[in-house]
A protein has these predicted regions:
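Iron-associated oxidoreductase/ferritin-like identity signal
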Residues: 1-159
Length: 159
């Protein structure tokens, strides 16, 4: 959707999709943080607990913006994938973070196109944390941090 063509109603609908993804992240991080086993996952399990708290804050911020736009915030999470394999769970989380980053980059442009600069700024702040989550997950997986903007991976250790 071209940013200049977006309406407040469409933005609220897209933010509701983002809110459903935040709910998904909360559930996934709560579950994964408790079921990851083994010394190699102790650090990331603790980080996932922190991520769950941050995702709840994101959900509250996005809900407030949806209400501000005159819509009702969603109550339904996107489906949460599970696995018996720790690497699979971390990969699911990384895929979700990559999608969230792409979506929030779009939302920032859409908010600005509507003149909603304060809303864009709040989403920028969320985006910073989502990017940190992406780095944490890629590091735990021992892979390069995906560059979701260009579709090419970035060098490990660069931000």
């Amino acid at each position: 959707m071209a940013e200049q063509d977006i309406t407040r109603e469409q933005l609220a609908q897209l933010l509701n999709e983002d809110l459903s993804r935040e709910y998904q992240a909360i559930i996934a991080y709560v579950v994964y943080s408790q079921v990851l086993k083994g010394a190699e996952y102790m650090n990331i399990a603790a980080q996932l607990e922190e991520h769950a708290h941050q995702e709840l804050q994101h959900a509250l911020i996005i809900s407030r913006q949806i209400d501000y736009l005159g819509a009702m915030p969603s109550v339904t999470p996107k489906p949460v994938k599970t696995s018996e394999k720790a690497r699979d769970m971390l990969s699911f989380d990384l895929d979700n973070e990559n999608e969230t980053i792409r979506n929030y980059r779009d939302r920032i442009r859409q908010c600005e196109a509507l003149g909603e600069f304060a809303m864009a700024e709040q989403i920028r702040e969320i985006l910073v944390q989502e990017h940190d989550h992406q780095i944490d997950l890629a590091t735990a997986l021992g892979i390069e941090v995906p560059n979701v903007g260009a579709g090419r991976p970035r060098s490990k250790g660069t931000r």
